[in-house]
Amino acid sequence: MAGGGGDLSTRRLNECISPVANEMNHLPAHSHDLQRMFTEDQGVDDRLLYDIVFKHFKRNKVEISNAIKKTFPFLEGLRDRDLITNKMFEDSQDSCRNLVPVQRVVYNVLSELEKTFNLPVLEALFSDVNMQEYPDLIHIYKGFENVIHDKLPLQESEEEEREERSGLQLSLEQGTGENSFRSLTWPPSGSPSHAGTTPPENGLSEHPCETEQINAKRKDTTSDKDDSLGSQQTNEQCAQKAEPTESCEQIAVQVNNGDAGREMPCPLPCDEESPEAELHNHGIQINSCSVRLVDIKKEKPFSNSKVECQAQARTHHNQASDIIVISSEDSEGSTDVDEPLEVFISAPRSEPVINNDNPLESNDEKEGQEATCSRPQIVPEPMDFRKLSTFRESFKKRVIGQDHDFSESSEEEAPAEASSGALRSKHGEKAPMTSRSTSTWRIPSRKRRFSSSDFSDLSNGEELQETCSSSLRRGSGSQPQEPENKKCSCVMCFPKGVPRSQEARTESSQASDMMDTMDVENNSTLEKHSGKRRKKRRHRSKVNGLQRGRKKDRPRKHLTLNNKVQKKRWQQRGRKANTRPLKRRRKRGPRIPKDENINFKQSELPVTCGEVKGTLYKERFKQGTSKKCIQSEDKKWFTPREFEIEGDRGASKNWKLSIRCGGYTLKVLMENKFLPEPPSTRKKRILESHNNTLVDPCEEHKKKNPDASVKFSEFLKKCSETWKTIFAKEKGKFEDMAKADKAHYEREMKTYIPPKGEKKKKFKDPNAPKRPPLAFFLFCSEYRPKIKGEHPGLSIDDVVKKLAGMWNNTAAADKQFYEKKAAKLKEKYKKDIAAYRAKGKPNSAKKRVVKAEKSKKKKEEEEDEEDEQEEENEEDDDK
């Protein structure tokens, strides 16, 4: 329903809400009284149905709003259909942006729609798009349908229905004239009248309750003659309109006094006789939508040329969504009186259950039944369902795959499958009577269940079918033998009185069945020859060809000479080898989410390794992998390798893949130039030569003389002596190492940032005037010698504390003496500093500064000269 049934759903609701209007369109033109009465009653029915739907809508507003999880396309569809204004649409959108729940917004919209409730509101609510986007609306829609069907008012009570049924039965028994016919009405079923089918195109109402109401109104308002005349004219007009269409909904029932059989002509055009004439003679309107009660019992076989047309109509309009429950409780005696039989149509996609409680029926008391949803289905000819269905199933198991084209079309053409029973019959005999309704039952993946009372009859039929099919397997062509005192559903045991149409179909199908028999025999001979070859090759005992090709729990397939596939020579026999990997693949772990909002060009990047988090500093990372460039959350510094170990990923030994930034590994960031390639610093390795001359002399000297102090001048002399004894090739190795170290030094110096050192103290002129002391310091200079004399062991801090205590305890008058003295010294300092600044720096001070600078330069020059001399001496020694 949600996939494409939006148009169907709204159409069905529309038909349920206005059924009387649909029926009004097909009344005869001359029946003005009936038309006037229908017009008056139409308003009452419409208002009643409107109230039912409106109350159900009002009660289920909360459920509808809860089923709609998002505003699109619900609000947009209502706005496009002009059911809500643009202002209301914008207000609803603003409410959703302000975090108001969508269900609350939808409920407010439904409350506004309640004020102007009409059919377009339901059409917009249950549209195709809404049913796809909001699947929870499906059961709400079904609730609307159920309420309409359940609460639809019935104009007649149950007693009147029983009287009408009894009147119908009496009219059929007596076979009176046209006055005895009445319009047959059908009470509503539990399921929708045309669920899963296309609504009628001719405008006829499919709901049974409205048809029943119309018939009741006709009965009450007109006399018996007028009633029969009006109903006959109405049915004639409806039958003429519905006849050309493919989805007819009305079937005429013809009752003959001389024969108890009933016939429902096919609405499709036939070759011999048109059903339109019979509709003019005896027209009884029957809605085949919802069938409650029908009984087809104890019928006699009759001949009709339109049987083939009926079977074709059922074949092409096969419905796969109905449950057919046939219940017939028969008496042991056989009568020619027709009794009602119940046919229930319930929810789609179920299994048909056939219950036959009386196994003692005679061949003249065969049952037939058929019910469909919207397509016209014809009452079947007399037959035995129990034996025919078992015969068809057993024959299907043994003759599966006779022809590829036939097997594909067999699901739709059930009469062709039934006619294949001529394979077991003589060529001169007639074919059995087959059920025309089995085409509607033969649906893929459908099961049949039979009651326990039929088990004995079914088992007897299956044994005879096994006997018939065994002759085909032997390829002898003999006729099947029939046990005594047992009924069989095959061709030889079926009663006479077959219609001429059946004879024609049976004769036309005998040619194809004989070809199938020849194919089966040829197939058996071919498999016997293959068995001989297999015996010669494998030295095994001879086995029957058909049994060899058969496997356990698999149906036997008979291939014809035309469609048999030749086996390729290069194709290997036996089972195919498993070429797939036998090892179970390791399941991939959950992917690490990637953060696209990180700016990788920052100098500091957040990194993670396992559950440990930290911050990577690019400036430190540039200096090398041995530098501690990652700071954890607890302010600890780590190298990349140490941070990898800290995150419990030390076993991988690949920090470029273990450490991630925003979900990306450091390797990816370095490849994309977001991180610089850090210089790899390796441990210094001491090269060893064959003569042990490339050993570090400093380390060797320490090992030999661990307690002796090493003088650098003496050590250089020893190194120069060993350098002279080394060959040129060995010196080249050291020269290469020196060049590599120099290049490494130059590369590091480009990115080296010297640490910020302390600022140099400004040069102070010793001849400059000094600042005067404060009053407290003058007090301390006077009393400090006294305290030290009294307490010689006191520290400086203790002395200062005591002096501070004494200063605080001194009276203000005593403090004035020190304060006045400090003020005089301050005035003198001001005069001296002013005179010093006016004169400028003295020459002596300038000379001292110049001398200090010269001495520094001289020291640097002397050190450079010494280095150059040492290099020259080393070069001379090499020469």
Curated annotation (Swiss-Prot):
Short sequence motif D-box: positions: 165-168
Subunit description: Homodimer; isoforms are able to heterodimerize. Interacts with members of the HP1 family of nonhistone chromosomal protein, such as CBX5 and CBX3 via the PxVxL motif. Interacts with ETS1; the interaction is direct and modulates ETS1 transcriptional activity. Interacts with the MRN complex which is composed of two heterodimers RAD50/MRE11 associated with a single NBN; recruits the complex to PML-related bodies. Interacts with HIPK2; positively regulates TP53-dependent transcription. Interacts with CASP8AP2; may negatively regulate CASP8AP2 export from the nucleus to the cytoplasm. (Microbial infection) Interacts with Epstein-Barr virus EBNA-LP; this interaction is important for EBNA-LP coactivator activity.
Subcellular location: Nucleus; Nucleus, PML body; Nucleus, Nuclear body; Cytoplasm
Domain notes: The HSR domain is important for the nuclear body targeting as well as for the dimerization. Contains one Pro-Xaa-Val-Xaa-Leu (PxVxL) motif, which is required for interaction with chromoshadow domains. This motif requires additional residues -7, -6, +4 and +5 of the central Val which contact the chromoshadow domain.
Sufficient to mediate interaction with ETS1: annotated segments: 333-478
Note: The major isoform Sp100-A, has a calculated molecular weight of 54 kDa, but exhibits aberrant electrophoretic mobilities, with an apparent molecular weight of 100 kDa.
Posttranslational modification: Sumoylated. Sumoylation depends on a functional nuclear localization signal but is not necessary for nuclear import or nuclear body targeting. Sumoylated. Sumoylated with SUMO1. Sumoylation depends on a functional nuclear localization signal but is not necessary for nuclear import or nuclear body targeting. Sumoylation may stabilize the interaction with CBX5.
The species this protein was found in: Homo sapiens
Known role: Together with PML, this tumor suppressor is a major constituent of the PML bodies, a subnuclear organelle involved in a large number of physiological processes including cell growth, differentiation and apoptosis. Functions as a transcriptional coactivator of ETS1 and ETS2 according to PubMed:11909962. Under certain conditions, it may also act as a corepressor of ETS1 preventing its binding to DNA according to PubMed:15247905. Through the regulation of ETS1 it may play a role in angiogenesis, controlling endothelial cell motility and invasion.
InterPro entries found in the cross-reference section: HMG_box_dom, HMG_box_dom_sf, HSR_dom, SAND-like_dom_sf, SAND_dom, Sp110/Sp140/Sp140L-like
The protein's name in its UniProt record: Nuclear autoantigen Sp-100
MF terms (GO), sorted A to Z: chromo shadow domain binding; DNA binding; DNA-binding transcription activator activity, RNA polymerase II-specific; DNA-binding transcription factor activity, RNA polymerase II-specific; identical protein binding; kinase binding; protein dimerization activity; protein domain specific binding
